[in-house]
């Protein structure tokens, strides 16, 4: 989605970033453990950076697969691609920090799943997000704990903010992610309790590796 270091390289105790994924995939291609191809989509700044970092950080026995079996594909604002038999439209979220894309995916039912990126929703996303079936939106912390975590200073929102947004956009299913983890054992319960006061649809706060069926 964008070039912030925690997403490109991965940081300790967080989900590993895209550079680490490229390394592992190419490593397994080289050893014969990874069959087939893989395609990574991103805007021009991200794709250029991935090319450069991979060439500088990874050995040639791994980078030789880039452009051959591992494809780094540039996409533009409002561009639609067919991915796994689904029409996916990429869009610029209007970030003031770094160029960043979200996407809208057409589901088999004809309805849409929309991912808003790593920052709070901007009005420029409305043509994609309004009335979608599934909305994926970040929520850094509870609104009741905003003074503790300072989400707005980090260009993030709260559970209350995301839920009010989903209600306003007439979204039936809301998935919250990119949350703090200080009280991870009780996060689902606490976030659900706050969110249900502002959102009447189905609210999901998934744990790591939890699956959600989307149709």
Predicted features, each with a name:
Residues 120-210:
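Cap/insert and terminal regions of metallo-dependent hydrolase folds
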Residues 1-114, 120, 125, 189-215:
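Binuclear metal-dependent hydrolase catalytic cores
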């Amino acid at each position: 989605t964008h070039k912030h270091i925690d997403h490109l390289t991965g940081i300790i105790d967080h989900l590993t970033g895209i550079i680490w994924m490229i390394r592992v995939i190419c490593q397994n291609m080289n050893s014969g453990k990874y069959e087939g191809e893989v395609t990574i989509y991103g805007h021009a700044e991200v794709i250029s950076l991935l090319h450069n970092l991979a060439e500088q950080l990874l050995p040639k026995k791994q980078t030789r697969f880039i452009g051959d079996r591992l494809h780094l594909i540039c996409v533009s604002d409002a561009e639609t691609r067919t991915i796994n038999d689904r029409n996916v439209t990429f869009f610029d979220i209007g970030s003031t920090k770094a160029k960043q894309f979200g996407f809208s995916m057409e589901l088999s039912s004809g309805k849409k799943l929309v991912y808003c990126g790593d920052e709070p929703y901007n009005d420029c996303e409305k043509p994609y997000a309004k009335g979608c079936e599934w909305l994926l939106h970040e929520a850094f912390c509870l609104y009741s704990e905003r003074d503790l975590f300072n989400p707005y200073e980090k260009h993030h929102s709260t559970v209350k903010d995301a839920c009010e947004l989903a209600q306003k956009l007439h979204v039936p299913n809301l998935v919250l992610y990119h949350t703090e983890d200080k009280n991870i054992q009780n996060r689902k319960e606490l976030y659900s309790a706050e969110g249900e006061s502002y959102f009447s649809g189905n609210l999901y706060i998934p744990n790591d590796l939890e699956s959600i069926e989307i149709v």
